[in-house]
């Protein structure tokens, strides 16, 4: 029995090492593979069961030196890789967000009809849309028709056509009617008042003249015919895809360059150490 006790004790020999108390617990806890036995002034003694090795005592200086080497070797590489992945995710999100906000996708756009043929909107809206799309044609047509309208009203007032009763019938304010009656330049003011009252008719004539002019210019090859809506949408979609792919390729190239620079720096540090 006395011989068996030392023999069993030798088989259950324990390996320990000493670690400085001042080191942080979470940084060095992974090196301790057994429960804590002794906790005194400057050292903590931990033990782990081992079958062959006996008690092993390491100085606190050696433990700290090994720990610092491991921390210097591993964390920079892991940190840089995580940082580069984080930057890659942020840049990809920015590219997608900028491409989605700067350009509207053609699928989301409503199919816009020709404002000259669209009867579902008001006269003023048709005039505005026609001005945006056919401004070069609408402006000269509108100036010519407006000149004709004003000239007609002015000629009528000069020839003695009294339009004052007509203005009173349509409900023009009395102050304006009195100004037109008593002013020395009554003919011009009267013509201008009639010109403003006839605004809906003037806009209708302008839109009709613009439509006729556009058809004439297209038939003679002076204006290009707009493409069909489907072809236009397909072209816009292809352009948007090309822009997005170009931006993604640029960001990938930048990220690969940064990763290569980071790897080179990490390898250089390892060689120096």
Curated annotation (Swiss-Prot):
Keyword Transmembrane among record annotations: yes
Record-annotated DUF1279 domain positions: 118-230
Compartments it resides in: Membrane; Mitochondrion; Cytoplasm
Segments passing through the bilayer: 138-158
Disruption phenotype: Embryonic lethality in homozygotes mice after embryonic day 9.5. Tamoxifen-inducible Fam210a homozygous knockout mice exhibit decreased grip strength, lean mass of all limbs, bone mineral density, bone biomechanical strength, and elevated osteoclast activity with microarchitectural deterioration of trabecular and cortical bones.
Membrane-protein topology: Single-pass membrane protein
Free-text tissue specificity from the UniProt record: Expressed in skeletal muscle, heart, brain but not in bone.
Sorted UniProt keywords: Coiled coil, Cytoplasm, Membrane, Mitochondrion, Transmembrane, Transmembrane helix
Residue runs in coiled coils: 233-269
Phosphoprotein as UniProt keyword: no
Basic and acidic residues: bias regions: 106-116
Positions of disulphide bridges: none
Region feature (Disordered): 94-116
Role description: May play a role in the structure and strength of both muscle and bone.
Subunit comment: Interacts with ATAD3A.
Family statement drawn from the similarity comment of this UniProt entry: Belongs to the FAM210 family.
Protein name: Protein FAM210A
């Amino acid at each position: 029995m006395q011989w068996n006790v030392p023999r069993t004790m030798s088989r259950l020999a324990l390996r320990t090492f000493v670690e400085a108390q001042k080191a942080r617990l979470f940084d060095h806890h992974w090196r301790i593979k057994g429960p804590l036995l002794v906790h005194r002034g400057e050292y903590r003694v931990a033990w782990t069961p081992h079958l062959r090795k006996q008690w092993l005592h390491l100085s606190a200086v050696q433990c700290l030196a090994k720990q610092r080497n491991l921390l210097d070797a591993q964390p920079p590489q892991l940190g840089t890789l995580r940082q580069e992945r984080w930057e890659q995710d942020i840049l990809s999100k920015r590219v997608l967000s900028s491409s989605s906000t700067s350009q509207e996708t053609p699928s989301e756009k409503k199919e816009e009809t020709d404002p000259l043929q669209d009867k579902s909107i008001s006269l003023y809206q048709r005039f505005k849309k026609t001005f945006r799309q056919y401004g070069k044609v609408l402006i000269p047509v509108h100036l010519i028709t407006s000149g004709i309208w004003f000239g007609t009203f002015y000629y009528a007032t000069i020839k003695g056509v009294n339009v004052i009763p007509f203005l009173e019938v349509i409900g023009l304010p009395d102050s304006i009617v009195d100004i037109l009656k008593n002013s020395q330049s009554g003919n011009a003011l009267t013509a201008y008042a009639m010109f403003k009252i006839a605004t809906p008719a003037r806009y209708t004539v302008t839109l009709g003249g613009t439509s006729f002019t556009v058809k004439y210019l297209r038939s003679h090859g002076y204006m290009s015919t707009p493409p069909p809506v489907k072809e236009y949408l397909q072209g816009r979609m292809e352009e948007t895809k090309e822009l997005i792919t170009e931006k993604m390729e640029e960001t990938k190239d930048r990220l690969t360059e940064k990763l290569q620079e980071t790897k080179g720096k990490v390898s250089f540090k390892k060689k120096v150490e």
